[in-house]
Amino acid sequence: MDFDSVLSIASQNQGLSSLPKRYSLKTGPPKKDLKVGGVNSAAVQAFLKKKAVEQKNKEQQDKKAKEDLLAKRVELKSDRKARAMASRTKDNFRGYNGIPVIDQPKKRQSKGSSTEEQQSSTKYEGGDYDDEDNFDYEGTDSESEPSRPVKPQAISRPEYSNRVENKPKKLSAPARPASSSMNFADLLKLAEKKQFEPVELKVVKKTEERLRTAEEIRELEMERRVKKLDKGKDVRSDKNSGQKDSRSQTSSNPQKKHVDRDGKNGRFPRPSEEKHQSSSTSKKPKLQASSERTPTSAKLHGDRSNSGSSGALNSKSAMKNGASFQAKQAPPRPSQGQRPATPSDLTPRKGNVSLTQAKSSISGSCPPGAARPGQGPHKNSAHGRPSNFSTSGPSQKPANPGKLSRPGSNAPPRPGGSGVVRPFTGDPSKQPRPGGNLQSQQFPGSSRASLNGPKRMERGVSGSQINRMSSGPGRSQCTVVSETISTKNITPRPGMVQRPPGPQGPRTVIGPSGHRILVKPSGPALPPITSSYKRKFEDEEEYDSEMDDFIDDEGEDQDEISKHIREIFGYDKNKYKDESDYALKFMESSWKEQQKEEARSLRMAVLEDEEEERRELEEMQRKNAKKRK
């Protein structure tokens, strides 16, 4: 189509639209970006490849540098660790090359060192490094350390597995000559192989110990002491119970001879076990009329015995004797084997005191056969009653024969725990009236040995005496240590339950070998002595359920708190800045002072209540007066 034809068509169409269109606002089709020619894709690929290679080289160099550093570091670290472990386990390290020089495996090692050894052996195989030797390097362990697990050079896999299986063994002993041949690259490969193999590690839990307060330190000391004593008691009682038959028989014979011989001269030996009891028992004696005998219906109290308490065993065999004495018969005595002679026996010891006292009052009138140990029937039918028989006064606190002493010679009896005994002579013709002042043989150092007046021991023998008593029933006589016990000062502890007063204390009966035997009278059975009667130590920080919801204001400002304290109590903290907390811990008031304070505050509270009531009454009166107006 040429230009003329176009013009002619245009002229024809000219009249179709009065307004000719000059410009159009329509956007045309988008233009395609023309490709820039001459770009070589192979060149681009080569460039990218070059960059990747460079980066890889750089990474390898970094890795190598890092590995060198790590190798040096591991070497230093393991050397330090090995030295630390060597000093701890006393292994034979002569200079450190990574392997302890041990020619043959040692004998069984302690548990602690075996766990250390196990940890060190397992960490070689890519295990955890956080054992107790790692404490001073943990700050630097930021990077991953694949080369770490490669401490012992040239140890082959079978040796490794062997060591992991036999964990308690020491590092296996044969000298390894090939240790230097394995280079670092081989070690790295070995480590890479091993790093995914599972290693069983027993985690040793370390309980963090916090600093203790003064009270806690004291408590721990007490507990330790008590545990030691308990251990000692168990060992001693085991030994002694093995020897009890032979010892009791041999010991009671010389004892009898001593008493008989000295009874004629009018002076009486005091075997060593009585020596510290003289003061307490000499206060006890008060002669009783024959009407105040134990009732024949006395209950036997042997069932309370337990194997650990030799006092209880003693009372059990005592009950058999006691029953026959009560019924005034003369059956055969139990053989000596039934009476244990452990050092903790309180009853035999006390028996000797009453035996000598009784003999002193009748001046050897007792038949010598009466004190012979292995004898058959008691040679006592001449008198209506057994010749050595002790009763205790009606007002006396009851004792608990079944649990008279804890095992071990160091156990002091609880208050009310030891029977208070008043010996009298069994021969009715020679028996004095209760009011009479028959002088028992006065022991040197004892506070009051005369048997006159109604003085009675209301508490048991204090524990300090029994602690120092020698063991064994038949020791030779020795000097008496004078030691008086004031019964007035012994007050019950605040938390202690009072023992119910019984009708009468247990009667004591002199056994065939001169040992005293306790017989429980009729009446309600006493509750067993529990640990609440004898607290090992006062600890004021024990758990208290009422303190569960105690408000702890640790978050608050200390100055704010001390300001309130100053307002309430008038105590200014700033005045006492030099006082250490440790010193303040020991400035605690005694129980007596606390009781005084309690009483004072109670009085103040009562006064305040009265004041308040008075105020309320006045207020009511005023209101009533207003209403009336």
From Swiss-Prot:
One MF annotation (Gene Ontology) recorded for this entry: histone binding
Q: Does the keyword Secreted apply?
A: no
- Biological process annotations from GO: heterochromatin formation; nucleosome assembly; regulation of DNA-templated transcription; transcription by RNA polymerase I
Biased composition (Basic and acidic residues) is annotated at 53-93, 206-247, 257-277
Where is the region Disordered? Answer: 53-181, 206-533, 608-629
Q: Acidic residues composition bias: which ranges? A: 127-144
Q: GO CC terms for this protein?
A: nucleolus
**Which superkingdom heads the taxonomic lineage of this protein's source?**
Eukaryota
UniProt lists compositionally biased (Polar residues) regions at 111-123, 278-297, 305-327, 335-345, 353-364, 387-398, 437-450, 462-490
Chain segments carrying region Important for interaction with histones: 523-629
Q: Where is this region: Important for interaction with DNA?
A: 1-522
* Compartments reported by the entry: Nucleus, Nucleolus
Subunit note:
Interacts with histones. Interacts with a heterotetrameric complex formed by histone H3 and H4, especially when the histone tetramer is not bound to DNA.
Q: What is known of its domains?
A: The acidic C-terminal domain mediates interaction with histone H3/H4 complexes.
Q: Which family does it belong to?
A: Belongs to the SPT2 family.
Q: What is this protein called?
A: Protein SPT2 homolog
